[in-house]
Each structure stands twice: as structure tokens, then as C-alpha cells.
């Protein structure tokens, strides 16, 4: 069993006085962070958290969430990170599915069968001497993060200490490391992209400027004045920043904008080139512990639309009907590497279907060019990406079909200037119901960003001979609106 020293403990020993986290004007060193974490471990032990148990974390970006995530690793518990934008029903379902023993949160939340603790309670409540892991086993689970499948039912992706370690190492081999590096973190830490920065923070000994909530004005100013060298963004954020930048440019110390959430429009990249902003486009998912492919800034314009090549220790190929296909042939993107999950929690069938001989079948379609650059054609063909959030139509359809006046339902994405895409619903009625009633019903069952922005009524939904829903025809209807 391969082990490593406890990451934060080792970092606090190596560089105790180096700044770990900055939030607004507050600075916390690695040793101070370690001491906060040890204090929380005492309370987690007091309330009965033991090694191997799962603890749900429902918190917004902040020092508190960072402390709790590290404290759970110190006592050997698995952090189940919950999306703060989900509805109460969705959160309860995920906690039940993950078999968590309690919830730590910074929000008002009540659960009948699960003890709920505020951060104030775990920080300042009664304490017992905790057994702290001084070593991590790379095979052990560290986190579970839920991701929706094409069936719409969320699956808990198990990421081990080894997965997170490999992801951070792969990123450093790709982007390089500098003593003065500072990564501005504005992605939610309940997503793997945000969480991965916490791993890099303690492994690299790199300062993080943490933004509790997305604020384009604050981020723009921080890039100009706070010595930020790297930032992770999605296209909408990049557009927001360029609007604020105007005719100016950012300091040359900003060496990387890591762009995820799908390919960026060419005019956006051309503007970045003109202003000397190095954009690195990436491709990844929860199952790969964040990025697995990156297009360096050198190829921003010559390989427009490409997600680049795999990280150093990763492999990628395109398959069609189980056979590896040549360049420029469309097929399923299949990846392999030490950062790839070993499977889904309590989903043996889904794990066997998705991971075969170590290769992860992403469900995404794409092709490689003659030089091995990846082009992603469709992120799980039915997926709607709204403001960087993944929305699966099947989950919304399931809610719609639970309405007594809905006989059939189909959901697709429609273009939106602000969010990129938003859901649009098509419904066949079985009784009297209005569009307003349908949307209100969804608001009670779904996270706000998943609620359809429009509900249209049809006599029947387009289907093929096998009665499978033809989403492409629904997309055509959306385009004709």
C-alpha cells in the first residue's frame, strides 16, 4: 500500500510561514491553517466521526470550507461535497445515497435522519483528542462528488488521494511552477475544478487568492493588483473580464488563464492574443479529477476549438463500437491515467459500463487531428452547459413527468446570451395545465438553474421507429422560435 505524508501537515512543516490562503484582506499561513484544522478534528472526533465514514459538506467558498475539507482528511473520513445550488430534495437524495453519517454546513438546513452541524459548532464545540492521519494511503477514498449521468440519476464519483495527487502533478508538468505563483480561485470548491486548487495549494506550497462568490469587478481588480499568475475561468467569466479590461491589458505576471467549460469562440481568443493574455483551453470532468487535456497558449489560434493533448501521465483515444479509430474519425472520447476515478459509489453496473481495463468511456464525442489534438464535438450529446453548470435533460424530464397533467416531456438546450445555454421543455398534456404552472412545479423540485426557461406544448413528441425521443428535432423547433 503506497503512502505519502499528510499533505497539509507536511506543507506546514516545510514552509510554515508562507501564505497559504488570502480572502479579501485576510491572510492565513500554512501553519495557521494546520492549527485551525487540528482544532476542528477535535470536535469531529467528539461527535463521532471515524475513519472511513462519509461526511457531507454543504458550504460556500471560504476559509471555513477549506478547514473542514482538510479536517476530514486528517481524521480519515471521506468528504461528500454538495452543490449549494441544488434543491433540498436533491441534497437529501445525495446524502442518503452516499450513506453520510452527518452534515457540516454554513447554511440553514434541517434533516430528520442526519445530524447537522454548523461550522461554529465544529470549530468551537466540545473536543476530544483526535487520531490524526500522519500518512495518506493513495488507494483510499478522499472525496465523493456527484455528477449526473445520461439517465439523469446522479452518481457519486469516488476520488482517491492518489487521484488528487496525480491530477496536481499532471497540472504542474503541464503549466510549470514558479515561486511567485498565485492562483485566483473563484470556481466553487464543491466542483472538482475548484477542489483541485486546494490540492495544488498544499502540494505546491502555492498562495491562493480565494473569491467567496463570483464577482467580476473584484476579480478584474485582483488580476491587476494582487500578483495573480494563474486563474481558472469559463467563457462567460473571460468575456466579463475583457469587457472590464477595455483598451487596457493585464500585467505580464498573469501567465495563464485556464479555460474550461467547452471551446471558446475564436473572436474571444483573438482578443486575448491582441492583449497578450495566455489562454489554455482544457477538457476534463469530475471522473478525471479536473483537467485531463490542455491546449497551451502556443496553439490558441492555430488549433481553434481544440482541447489540446493529454497531460503527461495520461492517455487518450477515440473509439467507435469498441474499436480505436484513426485521425479525423468521430467517436467516443476514452481516457486513462492515474487521475481517473476507479468508479462510482454503490454503482457497480455503471462502473463496469464506464471503466473497462482502466479506460474511462466519457460518453463525449470527438476526434483527433493528425497531430493528436483533441476536438470535442458534443459533451454527452444531450448535455446542457449553463454558466459552467452541467444540466442533464433526463433529470428535468423525470420531474415534468411526475406532474399529473403531463403525459410526455422532452428537454433540450436553447441558446442564451448570458448563460450560454438554458433548458427548454416540450410537453404533451394529459390534462389542463398552463406553462406558468409547469414552470412553478419545476421550481419546487429543481435547482434554479435547472428550471426550464420556456415550456412549449405539442400534440406529440418526435420519436423514431423504436419510439426513442428525437432531441435533434426538438432543437430545430427551438431554433425556429
Swiss-Prot record:
Top-level class of the enzyme under EC nomenclature: ligase
EC number(s) stated in the UniProt entry for this protein: 6.2.1.26
GO biological process: menaquinone biosynthetic process
SUPFAM superfamilies attached to this UniProt entry: Acetyl-CoA synthetase-like
GO molecular function (one): ATP binding
HAMAP family attached to this UniProt entry: MenE
Function field: Converts 2-succinylbenzoate (OSB) to 2-succinylbenzoyl-CoA (OSB-CoA).
Name the UniProt record assigns to this protein: 2-succinylbenzoate--CoA ligase
Gene source species: Bacillus cereus (strain Q1)
Amino acid at each position: 500500500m503506497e503512502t505519502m505524508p499528510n499533505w497539509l501537515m507536511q506543507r506546514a512543516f516545510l514552509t510554515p510561514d508562507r501564505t497559504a490562503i488570502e480572502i479579501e484582506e485576510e491572510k492565513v499561513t500554512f501553519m495557521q491553517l494546520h492549527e485551525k484544522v487540528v482544532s476542528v478534528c477535535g470536535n469531529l472526533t467528539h461527535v463521532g466521526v471515524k475513519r472511513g465514514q462519509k461526511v457531507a459538506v454543504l458550504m460556500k467558498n471560504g476559509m471555513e470550507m477549506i478547514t473542514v475539507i482538510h479536517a476530514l482528511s486528517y481524521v480519515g473520513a471521506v468528504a461528500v461535497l454538495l452543490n449549494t445550488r441544488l434543491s433540498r430534495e436533491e441534497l437529501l437524495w445525495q446524502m442518503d445515497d452516499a450513506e453520510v453519517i452527518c452534515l457540516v454546513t454554513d447554511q440553514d438546513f434541517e434533516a430528520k435522519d442526519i445530524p447537522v452541524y454548523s461550522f461554529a459548532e465544529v470549530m468551537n464545540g466540545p473536543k476530544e483528542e483526535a487520531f490524526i492521519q500522519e500518512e495518506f494511503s493513495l488507494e483510499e477514498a478522499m472525496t465523493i462528488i456527484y455528477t449526473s449521468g445520461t439517465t439523469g440519476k446522479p452518481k457519486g464519483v469516488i476520488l482517491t488521494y492518489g487521484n488528487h495527487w496525480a491530477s496536481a502533478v499532471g497540472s504542474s508538468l503541464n503549466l510549470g511552477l514558479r515561486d511567485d505563483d498565485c492562483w485566483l480561485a473563484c470556481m466553487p470548491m464543491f466542483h472538482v475544478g475548484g477542489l483541485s486548487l486546494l490540492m495544488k495549494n498544499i502540494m505546491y506550497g502555492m498562495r491562493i487568492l480565494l473569491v467567496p462568490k463570483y464577482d467580476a469587478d473584484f476579480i478584474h481588480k485582483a488580476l491587476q493588483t494582487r500578483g495573480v499568475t494563474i486563474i481558472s475561468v469559463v467563457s462567460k467569466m473571460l468575456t466579463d473580464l475583457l469587457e472590464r479590461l477595455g483598451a487596457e491589458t493585464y500585467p505580464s505576471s498573469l501567465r495563464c488563464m485556464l479555460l474550461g467549460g467547452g471551446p471558446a469562440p475564436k473572436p474571444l481568443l483573438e482578443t486575448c492574443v491582441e492583449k497578450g493574455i495566455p489562454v489554455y483551453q482544457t477538457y476534463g470532468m469530475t471522473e478525471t479529477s479536473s483537467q485531463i487535456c490542455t491546449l497551451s497558449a502556443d496553439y490558441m489560434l492555430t488549433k481553434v476549438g481544440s482541447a489540446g493533448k493529454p497531460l503527461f501521465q495520461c492517455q487518450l483515444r477515440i473509439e467507435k463500437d469498441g474499436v480505436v479509430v484513426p485521425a479525423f474519425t468521430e467517436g467516443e472520447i476514452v481516457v486513462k491515467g492515474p487521475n481517473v476515478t476507479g468508479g462510482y459509489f454503490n454503482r457497480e453496473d455503471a462502473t463496469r459500463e464506464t471503466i473497462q481495463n482502466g479506460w474511462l468511456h466519457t460518453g463525449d464525442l470527438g476526434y483527433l487531428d493528425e497531430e493528436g489534438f483533441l476536438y470535442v464535438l458534443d459533451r454527452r450529446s444531450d448535455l446542457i452547459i449553463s454558466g459552467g453548470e452541467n444540466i442533464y435533460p433526463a433529470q428535468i424530464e423525470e420531474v415534468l413527468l411526475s406532474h399529473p397533467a403531463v403525459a410526455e416531456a422532452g428537454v433540450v438546450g436553447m441558446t442564451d446570451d448570458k448563460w450560454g445555454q438554458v433548458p427548454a421543455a416540450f410537453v404533451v398534456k394529459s390534462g389542463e395545465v398552463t406553462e406558468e404552472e409547469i414552470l412553478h412545479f419545476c421550481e419546487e423540485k429543481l435547482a434554479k438553474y435547472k428550471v426550464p426557461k420556456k415550456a412549449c406544448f405539442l400534440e406529440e413528441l418526435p420519436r423514431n421507429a423504436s419510439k426513442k425521443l428525437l432531441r435533434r428535432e426538438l432543437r430545430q423547433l427551438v431554433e425556429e422560435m
